[in-house]
Amino acid sequence: MKKQDLMSIDEIQKLADPDMQKVNQNILAQLNSDVPLIGQLGFYIVQGGGKRIRPLIAVLAARSLGFEGSNSITCATFVEFIHTASLLHDDVVDESDMRRGRATANAEFGNAASVLVGDFIYTRAFQLVAQLESLKILSIMADATNVLAEGEVQQLMNVNDPETSEANYMRVIYSKTARLFEVAGQAAAIVAGGTEAQEKALQDYGRYLGTAFQLVDDVLDYSANTQALGKNVGDDLAEGKPTLPLLHAMRHGNAQQAALIREAIEQGGKREAIDEVLAIMTEHKSLDYAMNRAKEEAQKAVDAIEILPESEYKQALISLAYLSVDRNY
């Protein structure tokens, strides 16, 4: 498939719209609770925008294997719920006050409510998996949530630590982001009755796409504008998170530059250092380095699903991979 033949994001969304409407309806239905605060906070976060890329992968993956049932909708919903719950917990841990262009749930409702409703959404996800009556998917999801939690703890340990290695950083990306993308593709393949090779292909697609997606997010933290990004530019540095662009700039800078970045990571919270850090990144092409790594991962995602039968849904998955590294939000 040539780059000029790629589908636009609007075309992909139009193709997936019948399924995604059902996913969105299911998300809202599953947030129902006799406890009013659960619904209020749940609706607040799920209606706050977001790319819905994980459920999109699930419905496109199932369709790419010719599946027309409803279990792919359940897969898409439970994957989005795990992601949503992790965001609620993330924002509390990071003390974030802005996401997707508006106040975070913890800023609006408080930390305790965010953590507890996050727990509710996590457990609701497991109820949804139980509906699929697939021990394999349950096992995959249980492992993924455990890996995600490990990634959260590892990232917490990395905060304010300039000695974080690139390998360590990439493990965190896999645990926190790529693993759940994997689940979206793999679970969809299982409910669609795909072969082992097709299941592996869609699992690999998810892993590579998830890695590319997070790498781009880390680049955008330094190169986007606040309105497009939907959060404060430079949040990672302010939070003392050593992401790939920072690690690259520190490794390639001179002693004075490396010391400045080390201090910025160790101290965190110093937004006034951003301009200096950006200048160092620009000099050493650190953002380009991270973006090129993202493009390599996106290409691996495309190559992974070469074995899938030709269809507009396969084209959509291919296009989605390329589009994920060609965005400013």
UniProtKB/Swiss-Prot annotation:
The keyword Transferase applies. Mg(2+) 1 binds at residues 90, 94. GO terms for biological process: isoprenoid biosynthetic process. It holds the Pfam family polyprenyl_synt. SUPFAM superfamilies: Terpenoid synthases. Keywords: Isoprene biosynthesis, Magnesium, Metal-binding, Transferase. It catalyses: 5 isopentenyl diphosphate + (2E,6E)-farnesyl diphosphate = all-trans-octaprenyl diphosphate + 5 diphosphate. GO terms for molecular function: all-trans-octaprenyl-diphosphate synthase activity; metal ion binding; prenyltransferase activity. Its EC number is 2.5.1.90. An all-trans-polyprenyl diphosphate binds at residues 99, 176-177, 214. Mg(2+) 2 binds at residues 90, 94. It is an enzyme of class 2 (transferase). Its cofactor is Mg(2+). InterPro entries: Isoprenoid_synthase_dom_sf, Polyprenyl_synt, Polyprenyl_synt_CS. Isopentenyl diphosphate binds at residues 51, 54, 83, 100. Binds 2 Mg(2+) ions per subunit. Belongs to the FPP/GGPP synthase family. PANTHER family: ALL TRANS-POLYPRENYL-DIPHOSPHATE SYNTHASE PDSS1, GERANYLGERANYL PYROPHOSPHATE SYNTHASE. Supplies octaprenyl diphosphate, the precursor for the side chain of the isoprenoid quinones ubiquinone and menaquinone. This is Octaprenyl diphosphate synthase. It comes from Haemophilus influenzae (strain ATCC 51907 / DSM 11121 / KW20 / Rd).
